[in-house]
């Protein structure tokens, strides 16, 4: 078989005796819900012998492998090469890529989570029996022919004695089997799953040492936001005022809008940063559905503004029961509405609230209704209340998702409203922390689909600590709570698995739509079976257990079975 050189160089350390013949290195496949524990060899219970992948056309599939050497090697490294995958009776050739998975620290323990570029690190085999993980990943082309594709992952490792090159170890191979199914997943921009991961532009500016909102800043942000768009992101995160969350992140979270009080007491607003950010996300990145603006009810209940009379920054103390409330928000909303109308963004923009009590939420809604009625309300809440019916985009925490009854979900869908779930530092599981079992992230998307919800919200896509490449801890949060991707536009195991869950949800949606379009008893029976089993598995009660890996495996089986049944009708 022609081996395509998708090669990753390894640099290996140590030396053999001159006459020693080195043994072959080791290459194994991690099971789906396993992580490599740094400096620890995987156990028999964690591994399998074959990379088995299955997916629709247009879907991303992946597996983790682990490589190590039982002897200390040095100088030029080994090569991990993946052959092209080919199927019988087709000329289609599919080429996976191999990406190293590097460790970072989480609560004092090394965790392999960072999906890096091949040239990022050089100490692949830093010592005897010190393993390194890789992700074998493939975006199946939308026009690929369905069928079974096979190929090989091969690892060899060079060795040296002193300064002399002495030869290579025997190579070791792992078979790859990919089943490409009949279904076709559309591009992420066309997915219906309502993904809302909050962006943090200032983190990118600080890491890359560029001036906020400069051309260099937007250049630096482009790969991160492109990666987010490729996961199906629908929402642009904006800020109406400084530190809406009262400074809970390592980097500042300033307002996208400058508030200015003139010497004559009138208000004006500088929307230049807001305009640049939204235009970039829409026009350059392609995230166009919703603009969520935080917030009218900040955690600190104050608004920072520039007082032209003194040349100093001052603060307004907000109180929903005080005349200051309307005196502050009336002029702003009037100006904001006019500006959004001019830009063509009025009907995409929402006023966003984060875990605010009902009386504050109602006060914000009253101001919006009076001064900018076209704006809609987004609200992340711990537990739904009587306001549930009124909020356009509602996101309860997953542990209270079952308090939104099915008839209310149906009503909200009919009105074009969104109902999503979120996780944050709670619950402990399922979640997307650095140390979370990988299947938990995928489980979240399946929970959304199984329960007729619209999507998923999480408070931080990239609110990095000082150096997440070294450690993902920050403050009082569980490690990794503040971000899902890493500097250098590096993905993570947890982000990739979250994306897998979104793809699962999209496949379920498409299967449901296909069953309705077919309209046959066989199609109805197939989709009813899928829905019933998913609803039985993906419950709030079950979310608190330890079965996320087996739940995801069963859901994948069900999706494949239903795909086969519906696409042969």
Sequence positions of predicted segments:
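Short, solvent-exposed loop/linker segments at the N-terminal edge
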Residues: 53-59
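Sec-dependent signal peptide recognition
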Residues: 2-9
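Short, surface-exposed loop/turn segments at beta-strand-coil junctions that are enriched for proline
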Residues: 70-72, 139-146
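Catalytic-core region of carbohydrate-active enzymes that cleave or remodel glycosidic bonds
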Residues: 393-476
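Surface-exposed binding patches on compact interaction domains or structured appendages
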Residues: 21-47, 60, 67-136
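Bacterial Sec-dependent signal peptides at the C-terminal "C-region" and cleavage site
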Residues: 12-23
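Catalytic domains of carbohydrate-active enzymes that cleave complex glycans
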Residues: 302-305, 313, 317-383, 453, ...
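Aromatic-lined carbohydrate-binding surfaces of glycoside hydrolases
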Residues: 102, 107, 111, 139, ...
């Amino acid at each position: 078989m022609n081996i395509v050189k998708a090669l990753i160089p390894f640099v290996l350390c140590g030396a053999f005796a001159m006459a020693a013949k080195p043994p072959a290195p080791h290459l194994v496949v991690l099971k789906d819900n396993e992580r490599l524990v740094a400096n620890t060899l995987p156990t028999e219970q964690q591994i399998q012998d074959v990379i088995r992948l299955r997916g629709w056309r247009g879907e991303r599939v992946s597996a983790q492998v682990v490589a190590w050497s039982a002897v200390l090697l040095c100088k030029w490294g080994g090569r991990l090469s993946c052959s092209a995958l080919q199927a019988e009776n087709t000329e289609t050739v599919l080429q996976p890529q191999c990406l190293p998975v590097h460790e970072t620290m989480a609560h004092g323990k090394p965790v392999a989570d960072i999906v890096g570029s091949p040239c990022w690190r050089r100490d692949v085999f830093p010592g005897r029996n010190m393993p390194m993980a890789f992700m074998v990943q493939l975006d199946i082309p939308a026009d690929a022919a369905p069928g079974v594709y096979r190929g090989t992952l091969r690892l060899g490792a060079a060795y040296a004695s002193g300064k002399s090159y002495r030869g290579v170890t025997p190579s070791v191979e792992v078979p790859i089997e990919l089943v490409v199914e009949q279904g076709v997943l559309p591009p992420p921009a066309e997915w219906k799953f309502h993904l809302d991961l909050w962006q943090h532009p200032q983190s990118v500016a600080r890491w890359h040492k560029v001036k906020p909102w400069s051309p260099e800043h937007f250049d630096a942000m482009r790969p991160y936001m492109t990666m987010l768009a490729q996961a199906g992101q629908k929402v642009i995160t904006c800020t109406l005022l400084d530190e809406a969350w009262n400074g809970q992140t390592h980097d500042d979270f300033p307002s996208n809008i400058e508030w200015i009080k003139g010497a004559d007491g009138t208000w004006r607003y500088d929307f230049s940063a807001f305009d640049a950010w939204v235009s970039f996300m829409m026009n350059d990145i392609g995230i166009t559905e919703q603009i969520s603006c935080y917030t009218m009810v900040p955690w600190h209940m104050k608004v920072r503004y520039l007082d032209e009379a003194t040349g100093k920054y001052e603060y307004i103390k907000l109180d929903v029961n005080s005349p200051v409330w309307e005196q502050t928000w009336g002029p702003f909303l009037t100006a904001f509405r006019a500006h959004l109308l001019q830009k063509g963004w009025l009907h995409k923009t929402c006023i966003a609230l984060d875990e605010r009590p009902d009386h504050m939420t109602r006060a914000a809604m009253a101001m919006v209704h009076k001064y900018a009625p076209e704006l809609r309300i987004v609200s992340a809440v711990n537990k739904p209340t009587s306001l549930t019916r009124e909020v356009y985009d509602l996101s309860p925490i997953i542990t209270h998702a079952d308090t939104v009854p099915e008839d209310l979900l149906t009503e909200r869908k009919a009105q074009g409203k969104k109902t999503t779930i979120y996780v944050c530092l709670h619950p402990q599981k399922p979640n997307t922390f650095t140390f979370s079992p990988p299947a938990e992230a995928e489980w979240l998307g399946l929970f959304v689909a199984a329960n007729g919800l619209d999507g998923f919200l999480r408070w931080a896509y990239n609110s990095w600590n000082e150096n997440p490449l070294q450690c993902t801890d920050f403050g009082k949060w569980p490690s990794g709570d503040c971000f899902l991707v890493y500097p250098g536009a590096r993905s993570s195991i947890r982000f990739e698995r979250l994306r897998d869950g979104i793809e699962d949800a999209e496949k379920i949606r498409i299967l449901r739509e296909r069953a309705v379009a077919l309209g046959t008893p066989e199609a109805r029976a197939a989709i009813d079976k899928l829905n019933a089993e998913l609803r039985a598995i993906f419950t709030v009660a079950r979310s608190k257990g330890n079965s996320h890996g087996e739940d995801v495996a069963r859901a994948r089986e069900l999706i494949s079975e239903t795909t086969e049944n519906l696409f042969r009708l």
